[in-house]
Every structure is written in structure tokens, then in C-alpha cells.
Design a protein with these regions (language model features):
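Flexible, acidic/Gly-rich N-terminal and inter-domain linker regions that tether
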Residues: 1-135
Length: 135
């Protein structure tokens, strides 16, 4: 498996979203002629995720509003594609390399209520209820 990233929003988070599903994948600068790969590409208002797995192609495209976080939108498209194609859902959802407890403390410090924090974890990060209870 190889990972291809392109565009301004395709950086650390997109790479590590792909690594949730393919932890040993190598990064590449171009689409390989053969073999499996996952690509995450962002443009000014468009996000595109493409997966070639076992000879089959899967893809997802999305238009993005200018006020939407480009990095999150790309990662969400990539994550959804990879969940659908692999039939796997990581228990911590889209969370990559962050400490959930710190996010909870930060949100509380900003005045968020517990229901809003839970909703953020379950919907925004796609975290399972069981993992949220651990945090």
C-alpha cells in the first residue's frame, strides 16, 4: 500500500488518517501503475479520496464551502471512504495522535457542556461511545 497526498489540506492529518487503516504504507509522489494505493487530494473547494485495493477502485469527492476547515473535510472524506471500502471502523474514529482527555479539558475550558463534548467526539471524530467513556 502506498499513500499519495496532494493539495494544501493534504498533510499530517490526511496521512495519519490513511495510516489508521494501512499503518505500514509508504508515501509516494505519484499514482503507482500497479498495486494498492490511497490518495487524498484537496483543491480550493474540492476534496477527492481514491483507493485502489485488491484491484478495485473506490472514490469519494466532495465540494467544500469556503468556511469549512479544509483539512478536516479532506480527512472526513478519506476516513468515510476507507471505512466503507475496508468494512472497518477504528474505535477512536478519526482521532490521530491526539490525547482525547486534553481535547475534553480544552472544550470544557471554552465553556462547552458535557452533551456537546460527547456529540463532538461521536460525530466530528467518529469515536465510538465505548472509547468516549474511557476518555
Amino acid at each position: 500500500m502506498q499513500i499519495l497526498l496532494c493539495g494544501p489540506a493534504a498533510g499530517y492529518e490526511a496521512e495519519h488518517t490513511a495510516r489508521l487503516f494501512f499503518p505500514t504504507a509508504d508515501k509516494t509522489d505519484s499514482i503507482p501503475e500497479n498495486g494498492d494505493f490511497v490518495a487524498a487530494c484537496s483543491h480550493e473547494k474540492t476534496d477527492f479520496a481514491l483507493l485502489r485495493l485488491d484491484g478495485r477502485l473506490y472514490w469519494r469527492t466532495a465540494l467544500r464551502d469556503t468556511d469549512t476547515d479544509a483539512e478536516y473535510a479532506l480527512c472526513r472524506a478519506l476516513y468515510t471512504l476507507l471505512c466503507d471500502a475496508t468494512k472497518r471502523t477504528p474505535p477512536w474514529g478519526m482521532m490521530t495522535g491526539v490525547r482525547p482527555v486534553r481535547i475534553i479539558h480544552d472544550l470544557r475550558a471554552m465553556g462547552w457542556q458535557e452533551d456537546a463534548i460527547r456529540d463532538r467526539f461521536l460525530r466530528h471524530f467518529a469515536c465510538t461511545p465505548e472509547k468516549f467513556r474511557l476518555a
